[in-house]
């Protein structure tokens, strides 16, 4: 995905929701994505797809498409590829959902083992663990799940049981939209493939942020 001004390019692993990295050039984006393969293998393992993922040896560019202004600004995928727009079979949908669930499980594991205080930036800024967790969950709840009709009270995600119930409802809503052939959202219409990979990316990006800023061993 190439930003309209060419400032940022995002490499997206279309078969592996959540694995996408941005950089200033296409080659740098691909190399950055490859550098995260070992980290993503932990997600694939949770999804019981580790052997399939670890068997990948080459990165092939199958499509180049235009991004949005946000692509250039954030270095994050904000546009739909032709693959995102392809129809999914029931089995393909379940594979995507299984990987998104694995991203959630990885996120939950990370937030339980990292330090509450996170390493600050060079100017002393940055969020601590609880703020990162709150942001990640709230954004998914209010921006992504809402697009498939899942409306949840703000405090419902504060307990393990509430979080599980919310995620189960989110999964089921995506299945329902898929069965009806519907796109996510009332105004901005998102293909379900994109909704899943964007939510998975957001979850993983903040899980990796917490790992990178963890002060447990320092």
Label each region the model flagged.
Residues 38-92:
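Short, charged, surface-exposed hinge/linker loops at domain edges
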Residues 54-60, 114, 181, 188:
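Generic structural motif recognizing short loop/turn segments at the entrances and edges of beta-strands
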Residues 1-49, 97, 108, 112-164, ...:
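Short, contiguous alpha-helical
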Residues 99-110, 165-173:
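Amphipathic alpha-helical packing segments from all-alpha helical-bundle domains
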Residues 2-6, 13, 69, 73-80, ...:
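N-proximal short alpha-helices
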Residues 172-183:
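Transmembrane alpha-helical segments of integral membrane proteins
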């Amino acid at each position: 995905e190439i930003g309209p001004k060419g400032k940022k390019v995002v490499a997206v692993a279309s078969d592996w929701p959540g694995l996408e990295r941005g950089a200033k050039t296409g080659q740098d984006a691909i190399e950055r994505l490859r550098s995260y393969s070992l980290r993503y293998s932990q997600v694939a393992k949770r999804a019981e797809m580790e052997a399939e993922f670890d068997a990948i040896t080459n990165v092939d560019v199958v499509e180049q498409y235009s991004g949005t202004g946000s692509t250039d600004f954030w270095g994050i995928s904000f546009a739909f590829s032709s693959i995102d727009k392809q129809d999914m079979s029931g089995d393909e949908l379940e594979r995507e959902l299984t990987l998104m669930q694995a991203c959630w499980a990885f996120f939950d594991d990370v937030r339980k083992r990292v330090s509450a205080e996170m390493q600050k930036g060079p100017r002393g800024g940055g969020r601590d663990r609880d703020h990162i967790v709150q942001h990640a969950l709230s954004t998914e709840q209010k921006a992504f799940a809402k697009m498939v009709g899942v409306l949840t009270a703000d405090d419902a995600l504060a307990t393990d049981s509430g979080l599980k119930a919310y995620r189960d409802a989110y999964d089921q809503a995506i299945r329902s939209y898929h069965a009806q052939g519907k796109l996510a959202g009332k105004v901005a219409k998102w293909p379900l493939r994109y909704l899943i990979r964007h939510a998975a990316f957001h979850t993983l990006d903040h899980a990796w942020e917490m790992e990178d800023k963890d002060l447990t061993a320092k």
